[in-house]
């Protein structure tokens, strides 16, 4: 979907095409959100753990980075699971309504 659709074009889509388009947009938004979260966490961990410039990481810096990223990934996995559960509940609720 490289081209941008105008409102009139969107109105002409079938309900199935609209669902497909919305699903694709949601998927792209989720990917972008995940990328931004990973970038943010990486920057935070680097800022927290790397205290002085050098040609190599010290053992303390490596451990700090590992722990920081582990905590981030654990938190991210929990948040993602909760979001997936919520989306599934909303889909199930919408399905029951139709």
UniProtKB/Swiss-Prot annotation:
Positions occupied by motif Twin CX3C motif: 45-68
Free-text comment about domains: The twin CX3C motif contains 4 conserved Cys residues that form 2 disulfide bonds in the mitochondrial intermembrane space. However, during the transit of TIM13 from cytoplasm into mitochondrion, the Cys residues probably coordinate zinc, thereby preventing folding and allowing its transfer across mitochondrial outer membrane.
Compartments (UniProt record): Mitochondrion inner membrane
A Gene Ontology cellular-component term: mitochondrial inner membrane
Source organism: Brugia malayi
Cystine pairs: 45-68, 49-64
Keywords assigned by UniProt, alphabetized: Chaperone, Disulfide bond, Membrane, Metal-binding, Mitochondrion, Mitochondrion inner membrane, Protein transport, Translocation, Transport, Zinc
Gene: TIM13
Described purpose of this protein according to its UniProt entry: Mitochondrial intermembrane chaperone that participates in the import and insertion of some multi-pass transmembrane proteins into the mitochondrial inner membrane. Also required for the transfer of beta-barrel precursors from the TOM complex to the sorting and assembly machinery (SAM complex) of the outer membrane. Acts as a chaperone-like protein that protects the hydrophobic precursors from aggregation and guide them through the mitochondrial intermembrane space.
Full protein name: Mitochondrial import inner membrane translocase subunit Tim13
Top-level taxonomic group: Eukaryota
Topological category with respect to the lipid bilayer: Peripheral membrane protein
Quaternary structure note: Heterohexamer; composed of 3 copies of TIM8 and 3 copies of TIM13, named soluble 70 kDa complex. Associates with the TIM22 complex, whose core is composed of TIM22.
BP term (GO), one: protein transport
Taxonomic lineage of the native organism: Eukaryota, Metazoa, Ecdysozoa, Nematoda, Chromadorea
UniProt cross-references to InterPro entries, sorted A to Z: Tim10-like, Tim10-like_dom_sf
Family: Belongs to the small Tim family.
